[in-house]
From Swiss-Prot:
Catalytic activities: alpha-D-glucose 6-phosphate = beta-D-fructose 6-phosphate
One family name in Pfam for this protein: PGI
Superkingdom assignment: Bacteria
Protein name (database record): Glucose-6-phosphate isomerase
Amino acid sequence: MANYLPSSPAWLAFSQAAKSASRGGERLRIIEAAGLRVDLTAQPQSDSLDNAAQDLLAQQNFDAARAQLYDGGEANWTERRPAWHTALRADNPPPAVAQDILAERERVRRFVRELDQSLAYDCVLHLGIGGSDWGPRMVTRALRHGGLRRNIQFASNVDSHAVADAIGQLDPRRTLVIVASKSFTTTEPLANAEVAMNWLRDAGVADPIKHVVAVTANVDAALDFGISPDRVFRFWDWVGGRYSLWSAIGLPIALALGNEALDQLLAGAAAMDQHFLQAPLRKNAPLQMALAGLANRSVLGYATLAITPYDSRLMHLVPWAQQLEMESLGKVASRDGTPVGVPTGPVVWGMPGTDCQHTFFQWLHQDTTGAPVDFIVCERPDHAYARHHNMLIANCLAQRSALLRGKSYEDILQEIREHEPDLQRAEVLARHRVHPGGRPSNLIVLPRLDAYSLGALLALYEHKVFAQGVLWGINPFDQWGVEFGKLLAKRIIRELDAPSADTSGDQDPSTRYWIDSLSRR
């Protein structure tokens, strides 16, 4: 990159415009995208900020980076591969990968149809971790209100309490086991697969491997594991784990909800892909969310982002978004290896409303720091309790309004003085009740929670994260921090398995103490 970001002209102009922009929500700003409505009214706004954003996008070569994403260029430059998840959900994938994508897509759907017809399995045990787990787990939980075709349980943690809990809810003779791992060397799914195989064997299943399918980019490793070729579903090394939901990793979604649901999920995401590609800057929802997030994180100093879906069915959206945002944007180096020089990805956290209001909203309203909030709500519910849904919407809108508007010391003092004759006490009480306001938020409104709208919502966040990666000049498609931790864990496992080995010089003092102590348990 030609300019060091913090001292580049476009960044300096963007920073100044963000600091001076209005944060009072005076100008209504709602963007329609793939059936969703995204309200950015409560974000920093001004004409000068819009103009500075356009200059920053030009400086960071955004149009070229976006074209590279869609065209299969080397978007993941540190690993020298594309990040072509948009191709996975396209009706007509790019010619270079169309045959492979369409063939594997049809293999997944044919397999689901065959199982539906044979009634061979009414239980599914899904073993994955990270992107191969959170995506299918989140979608299946979000859409199960329409009914599940199979009893599906997910186990990801290498803590065997998790897989024990999952298999305790399944009939081994009627269970299909899915082992989902890009490399097919990942510790957690393979360790849990061993538990599952023993469980099937102990239940009297004559040939447990016939109950197992694999979803992987390493087909040879799955075959070496003993899985039949017709039960190995493939994706490619250019599919990042946190974007793999759109590939054959979506198999458990189709098994649980049907092929039609998976198709609609992809269609919603594809519609958002087209919006992100074609919509102009001021009407581009992912891009405007990215710019608002950039201003909040790198200029205004907000270190975190709260996501509060006012729909309990989206209970797994937050951990899915945590992985997407924090694994993608928790980076320190720009494209040429120099430090980025500004704060990058925020800590993402949250939970569904209205539970969140009784957990952490006090902090959002009155803490000295605060955080931007993404509020998510559906226009229409899938239950018959209309007034309950009105209550849910009212709480969502009220919390957002309170964070934006705040309440001044003078207004609160006037209210307290109506029933408190002691002026000194009234003044003290008033200071405890001040709400600073001016706290940024987005409101994302879905027509209802169906597969199409959910696909659009997930792609909205994916493209927001990609755009922020471009603006910061970082690679949102690698995860070297994760890989380093895995490497160290493998070394420690060897020492725990063979505590007599003399490796005293390989660890820091605390880690050495605990290896020695816990290996004697």
